[in-house]
Amino acid sequence: DEDPADLVFYLRNENEANEDEPGSRYELRREYWTYALPIIQKAHGEDGSFSNVNPSRDNWINGFFGIGGFYLCCVANFDAARAEVVFGRGNKQENKAAFDSLYTHKTEIESALGTTLQWNRGDDIKSSKVFIQLNNVRIENETDWLQMANFHADWTKKFYDVIVPYITVDWQ
């Protein structure tokens, strides 16, 4: 017989969705990235920034370009999608210096891309980022997935082609 004093009980918050539960936001995200990742990987090529990336339960996936702490990021939210270049090293000053260096080329970069970008130095946080956002799409709406995946693929590839060369000059 088991001694009741040896029993362990685990409590679970009924208000929190189980990440493996069908219909949870985690399952939805993994399904979206499973759909989108091949499109993103194809845009970047066989050995590209996203070649070693797997579907995730998070609302983001990162692609890398060979400079530690700096990366491309695809974000899929319930109200928008974003493509980002992130300066996310552990050293805040290095992130700000890299961002500031890139910002000196803002006009050239935006001219080459044919659009204005969002430049977020993030003075109150460690990281900095440059991004573009696609509004009026929702990860929960599967009919938006192709548009979102193409947006992620196209813009992270454009960022890789246009922005990353400016970063590699100073931070390789």
Where do the model's predicted regions map?
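Mixed-charge intrinsically disordered linker/loop segments at interdomain junctions
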Residues: 1-23
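Low-complexity, intrinsically disordered regions enriched in charged/polar residues
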Residues: 2-5, 26, 30, 34, ...
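Hydrophobic transmembrane alpha-helix bundles
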Residues: 2-6, 82-96, 149-166
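Hydrophobic transmembrane signal anchors and adjacent membrane-proximal interface regions, especially
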Residues: 9, 35-38, 139, 169
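Short linear sequence elements within intrinsically disordered, low-complexity coil regions
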Residues: 14-15, 37-38, 70, 150, ...
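Ampiphathic alpha-helical segments that act as solvent-exposed interaction surfaces
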Residues: 101-113, 136-172
